[in-house]
Regions:
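Actinobacteria-biased recognition of intrinsically disordered, low-complexity terminal regions
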Residues: 1-15, 104-110
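Short charge-dense sequence patches
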Residues: 1-6, 24-26, 34-45
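Short, charge-rich amphipathic alpha-helices with coiled-coil/heptad character
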Residues: 7-32
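Long amphipathic alpha-helical coiled-coil segments
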Residues: 86-110
Length: 110
Protein backbone atom coordinates (compact mmCIF):
# COMPACT_ATOMS: atom_id res chain seq x y z
CA UNK A 1 0.00 0.00 0.00
CA UNK A 2 1.36 3.42 -0.94
CA UNK A 3 0.55 4.98 2.45
CA UNK A 4 2.43 2.37 4.43
CA UNK A 5 5.40 2.64 2.07
CA UNK A 6 5.46 6.43 2.48
CA UNK A 7 5.10 6.12 6.25
CA UNK A 8 7.91 3.54 6.27
CA UNK A 9 10.13 5.99 4.36
CA UNK A 10 9.28 8.85 6.73
CA UNK A 11 9.90 6.76 9.83
CA UNK A 12 13.16 5.36 8.42
CA UNK A 13 14.44 8.91 7.97
CA UNK A 14 13.53 9.74 11.56
CA UNK A 15 15.41 6.67 12.79
CA UNK A 16 18.47 7.32 10.62
CA UNK A 17 21.61 8.89 12.09
CA UNK A 18 21.65 12.68 12.18
CA UNK A 19 25.27 12.93 11.07
CA UNK A 20 27.98 10.90 9.47
CA UNK A 21 28.06 8.84 6.29
CA UNK A 22 24.76 7.08 7.04
CA UNK A 23 22.83 10.30 7.66
CA UNK A 24 20.29 11.14 4.94
CA UNK A 25 21.05 14.19 2.85
CA UNK A 26 19.06 17.37 3.23
CA UNK A 27 17.78 16.84 -0.32
CA UNK A 28 16.52 13.38 0.62
CA UNK A 29 14.80 14.76 3.72
CA UNK A 30 13.16 17.57 1.76
CA UNK A 31 12.06 15.32 -1.10
CA UNK A 32 10.44 12.88 1.30
CA UNK A 33 8.80 15.74 3.19
CA UNK A 34 7.34 16.96 -0.10
CA UNK A 35 5.94 13.49 -0.78
CA UNK A 36 4.43 13.48 2.70
CA UNK A 37 2.87 16.91 2.26
CA UNK A 38 1.37 15.80 -1.05
CA UNK A 39 -0.18 12.79 0.68
CA UNK A 40 -1.52 15.03 3.46
CA UNK A 41 -3.20 17.24 0.86
CA UNK A 42 -4.72 14.18 -0.80
CA UNK A 43 -6.05 12.97 2.55
CA UNK A 44 -7.54 16.42 3.23
CA UNK A 45 -9.28 16.33 -0.15
CA UNK A 46 -10.58 12.83 0.57
CA UNK A 47 -11.93 13.95 3.95
CA UNK A 48 -13.79 16.86 2.32
CA UNK A 49 -15.22 14.58 -0.36
CA UNK A 50 -16.36 11.99 2.19
CA UNK A 51 -17.91 14.63 4.45
CA UNK A 52 -19.81 16.05 1.48
CA UNK A 53 -21.06 12.58 0.52
CA UNK A 54 -22.19 11.96 4.10
CA UNK A 55 -24.07 15.28 4.16
CA UNK A 56 -25.73 14.61 0.82
CA UNK A 57 -26.74 11.11 1.83
CA UNK A 58 -28.09 12.25 5.20
CA UNK A 59 -30.17 14.95 3.50
CA UNK A 60 -31.59 12.58 0.90
CA UNK A 61 -35.29 11.75 1.25
CA UNK A 62 -36.76 8.42 0.30
CA UNK A 63 -34.99 5.34 -0.87
CA UNK A 64 -34.06 2.24 1.03
CA UNK A 65 -33.33 3.26 4.63
CA UNK A 66 -31.27 0.12 5.22
CA UNK A 67 -29.10 0.81 2.19
CA UNK A 68 -28.64 4.44 3.22
CA UNK A 69 -27.62 3.33 6.71
CA UNK A 70 -25.07 0.88 5.31
CA UNK A 71 -23.68 3.55 3.00
CA UNK A 72 -23.50 6.10 5.84
CA UNK A 73 -21.69 3.56 8.00
CA UNK A 74 -19.22 2.83 5.21
CA UNK A 75 -18.58 6.51 4.50
CA UNK A 76 -18.22 7.27 8.20
CA UNK A 77 -15.68 4.47 8.64
CA UNK A 78 -13.70 5.73 5.66
CA UNK A 79 -13.78 9.27 7.06
CA UNK A 80 -12.59 8.06 10.47
CA UNK A 81 -9.73 6.15 8.80
CA UNK A 82 -8.73 9.20 6.76
CA UNK A 83 -8.80 11.31 9.95
CA UNK A 84 -6.55 8.82 11.74
CA UNK A 85 -4.17 8.49 8.81
CA UNK A 86 -3.92 12.27 8.50
CA UNK A 87 -3.30 12.76 12.22
CA UNK A 88 -0.53 10.17 12.23
CA UNK A 89 1.00 11.59 9.06
CA UNK A 90 0.99 15.12 10.49
CA UNK A 91 2.83 13.94 13.61
CA UNK A 92 5.54 12.21 11.60
CA UNK A 93 5.83 15.12 9.16
CA UNK A 94 6.24 17.54 12.06
CA UNK A 95 9.10 15.49 13.49
CA UNK A 96 10.77 15.16 10.10
CA UNK A 97 10.32 18.87 9.39
CA UNK A 98 12.19 19.65 12.63
CA UNK A 99 14.92 17.23 11.60
CA UNK A 100 15.22 18.88 8.17
CA UNK A 101 15.36 22.32 9.80
CA UNK A 102 18.23 21.17 12.02
CA UNK A 103 20.02 19.66 9.01
CA UNK A 104 19.53 22.90 7.08
CA UNK A 105 21.00 24.90 9.98
CA UNK A 106 23.97 22.53 10.25
CA UNK A 107 24.59 22.83 6.51
CA UNK A 108 24.47 26.63 6.67
CA UNK A 109 26.86 26.68 9.63
CA UNK A 110 29.40 24.45 7.87
Amino acid sequence: MADSTLMDRLEALLEAPTDGADAPSLTHLETTLTDGYARALALEAERVRLARQISELAARDGGDAGEQTRELNSLSARLAKADGDLSRLRLVLGALRRRAKAARAATAAA
